[in-house]
Amino acid sequence: MKTEDFRDNEYLEEYLKELWGNGANIAIAKLNDLINWGRSNSVWPLTFATSCCGIEFMCLGAARYDFARFGWEVTRNSPRQADVVFCCGTIVHKMAPVLKRLYDQMSEPKYVIALGSCAISGGPFKSSYHTIMGIDKIIPVDVYIPGCPPRPDAMIYGMIQLARKIKVQNFFKLPNLSHIEGNSLKKGERQ
């Protein structure tokens, strides 16, 4: 494959179909695993903190818990550079459009971790008229970390769960080639 062909996504998709049709699905699966390994070990987080869970989140950067050992050390101030947003605290109706815009500005693939009972279900403020009953009403959530506030150990466990989720995702869109003779795999299925 010539270098200039890498600029065109359609050419790459056709090349993948050709590889898949010729039985090179093992190579694609291994490349998928390699890319997912790299993505899961170099996640750039963005913190959207509105209350006390954000204060507890700061413990992760200290020496005792040190979330840099999991590859999460490069925190970002811009959603355009972040892979995951940690939503910590109560979200009121006035903050909902801000959170939605922040999520929309993130590049794909993007992940969301709801941190604490306020972000998950409204927490102790759930009976208030201005509180949203969980951020999953606004944006899709990948990992929920309960607690008021959750301990740093629970936050690290949630980060590990998200890394596991990233490792099993398909980076390449594999074509549906169930019509090819001798191909027993369905779309998205791996050997």
Swiss-Prot record:
Protein EC: 7.1.1.-
Purpose: NDH-1 shuttles electrons from NADH, via FMN and iron-sulfur (Fe-S) centers, to quinones in the respiratory chain. The immediate electron acceptor for the enzyme in this species is believed to be a menaquinone. Couples the redox reaction to proton translocation (for every two electrons transferred, four hydrogen ions are translocated across the cytoplasmic membrane), and thus conserves the redox energy in a proton gradient.
GO terms, molecular function: 4 iron, 4 sulfur cluster binding; iron ion binding; NADH dehydrogenase (ubiquinone) activity; NADH:ubiquinone reductase (non-electrogenic) activity; quinone binding
Family assignment from sequence similarity: Belongs to the complex I 20 kDa subunit family.
Species this chain originates from: Azobacteroides pseudotrichonymphae genomovar. CFP2
Membrane topology term: Peripheral membrane protein
Subcellular location: Cell inner membrane
Gene (name only): nuoB
Class of the enzyme per the UniProt entry, highest EC level: translocase
Main location as per UniProt: membrane
Database matches in PROSITE patterns: COMPLEX1_20K (PS01150)
Protein name (record): NADH-quinone oxidoreductase subunit B
Biological-process GO terms, alphabetical: aerobic respiration; electron transport coupled proton transport
Entry's Gene Ontology cellular component terms: plasma membrane; respiratory chain complex I
Catalytic reaction equation(s): a quinone + NADH + 5 H(+)(in) = a quinol + NAD(+) + 4 H(+)(out)
Residues given in the record as [4Fe-4S] cluster binding sites: C52, C53, C118, C148
Disulphide bridges, residue numbers: none
